[in-house]
Design a protein with these regions (language model features):
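N-terminal pre-ligand scaffold of iron-sulfur
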Residues: 1-60, 74, 90-120
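Short cysteine clusters
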Residues: 45, 65-68
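Short cysteine/histidine-rich metal-coordination sites, predominantly Zn2+-binding motifs
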Residues: 59-66, 79-88
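M16/MPP (pitrilysin/insulinase) zinc-metallopeptidase core fold and M16-derived inactive scaffolds
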Residues: 72-74, 78
Length: 120
C-alpha cells in the first residue's frame, strides 16, 4: 500500500519516556520516545480498540494501554505477557531538521483501525 511521510511534531515537544497522539491523514498515530529513539505505532489497542493517549505510559521499551494494562513493544508492536493480543501496526518514522515525520498509508483508514471511546 503506498504511503507518504508527513511532518507531525517537533522532536523537542515529545519528551523522553512520553507519548503523544496525532491524526495523520486520518490515521491515529501514537508517537513514543524512549532513550532518545522515536517510535510510531497505531494509536489503537488490539484488545478493545482503546486509544493509548492521553493516559498510556512508556516504560522499558513498551507502551501500556490505559484501559486494561496490555503492554506492546515499541520496536515491533508485539504484545508482551500472556495476553496474546495481535501486534500493533507500526509506521516508519524519521527525524528531519528537528521534526518527527511519520509515513502513513495514502488510503484512509478503515473503521478497524480507528480507536473507540469506552463507555463509562
Ligand atoms: S483495550 Fe487495551 S488492554 Fe484492553
Amino acid at each position: 500500500m503506498p504511503e507518504t511521510y508527513h511532518r507531525v511534531v517537533l522532536a523537542q515537544d515529545v519528551p523522553d519516556r512520553s507519548l503523544a497522539g496525532f491524526v495523520v491523514n486520518g490515521w491515529p498515530v501514537l508517537i513514543a520516545r524512549e532513550e532518545g529513539a522515536f517510535h510510531a505505532l497505531i494509536n489503537r489497542c488490539t484488545h478493545q480498540a482503546a486509544s493509548f493517549t492521553p493516559d498510556g505510559r512508556v516504560r522499558r521499551g513498551a507502551v501500556m494501554c490505559p484501559l486494561h494494562g496490555a503492554r506492546f513493544k515499541l520496536d515491533n508492536g508485539e504484545c508482551l505477557g500472556g495476553a496474546g493480543y495481535a501486534p500493533l501496526l507500526r509506521f516508519s518514522v524519521r527525524e528531519v531538521d528537528g521534526w518527527i515525520e511519520v509515513a502513513v498509508p495514502d488510503e484512509a483508514p478503515g473503521a478497524e483501525h480507528l480507536p473507540v471511546t469506552p463507555l463509562s
